Amino acid sequence: MKGTYIFLADGFEISEALTTVNMLRRGGINVKTVSIYDDRIVTSSNRIPVVADMAFGEFRASTSFGPCLPSDVMIFPGGMPGSSNLAAFGKLMDIMQQHYTEGGTLAAICAAPSVVLSLLPDLQGKRMTCYDGFEEALTTKGAEYVKEGVVTD
């Protein structure tokens, strides 16, 4: 997967998703929002409808897959049940696993590290953070929970 994408599912935390998009675009990064549905409209955890740049089918059709660079990024905002909806979408989780295996970068916010990234098969020794109370999903997979706002590993 080439590029930077932030994936949206119903119940996402709007501030985590759209503030991230805003800051990245201001910084010159061409980030695209992707609805995991056939429709571009996704509803936030506070019932605010948002129009994504593309629906999941458009993402699959327009994105080149293959060897990744660290600059190829998949971003998962938090929010509940948004994070659970992302994690339940098998096609996206398959792409995440492939992307991670090929050396692409994964970024997750708030609940998403525990709910989404914990689905990766090997977190042994990875330093990770998440929303308070969600640590167990990471530590049971061998990750080291770090109580910090931002962690890079």
Where is each model-derived feature located?
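Active-site-adjacent pocket-lining segments in enzyme domains
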Residues: 2-12, 23-35, 39, 53-153
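Histidine-anchored nucleotide/phosphate-binding helix
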Residues: 19-21
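A cross-family phosphate/adenosyl-ligand binding-site feature
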Residues: 44-53
